[in-house]
């Protein structure tokens, strides 16, 4: 579940796609995973507080698994840590807020085109 939490992490991107170099596939994956986590949370299957203490090792494993280049892994890890830390909500809206943060920080710029 933590994999989806991090990968989803960018849900309601409203900016003009021409202004941001994020891959549409990446945005869609983040959006869909955030939406599914929100539904699972509302159904009681996911606890949003569970993800507050994700370790650097878990972040590294996830970035490697999805194909983030070695030179971008620390940048992506920093975005993930910052977004999780800045969200104060402890309810199911947390997933949407983290997604918004990821999109603002253009996390998809660091993911491969063929996610």
UniProtKB/Swiss-Prot annotation:
Organ and tissue specificity: Salivary gland (at protein level).
UniProt subcellular location: Secreted
Entry annotated with the keyword Signal: yes
InterPro entries (UniProt xref): PBP_GOBP_sf
This protein's UniProt keywords: Complement system impairing toxin, Disulfide bond, Secreted, Signal, Toxin
Gene Ontology CC terms: extracellular region
Main subcellular location of this protein, as a coarse class: secreted
Miscellaneous field: Recombinant protein produced in Pichia pastoris is monomeric in solution and does not inhibit the classical pathway of complement in vitro; however, antibodies against this protein inhibit the anti-complement activity of sand fly salivary gland homogenates.
Quaternary structure note: May form multimers.
Task of the protein: Salivary protein that inhibits the classical pathway of complement system activation in the host while having no inhibitory effect on the alternative or lectin pathways. Prevent cleavage of host C4 and consequently impairs the activation of factors downstream of C4b in the complement cascade.
Protein's recorded name: Salivary anti-complement protein
UniProt organism field: Lutzomyia longipalpis (Sand fly)
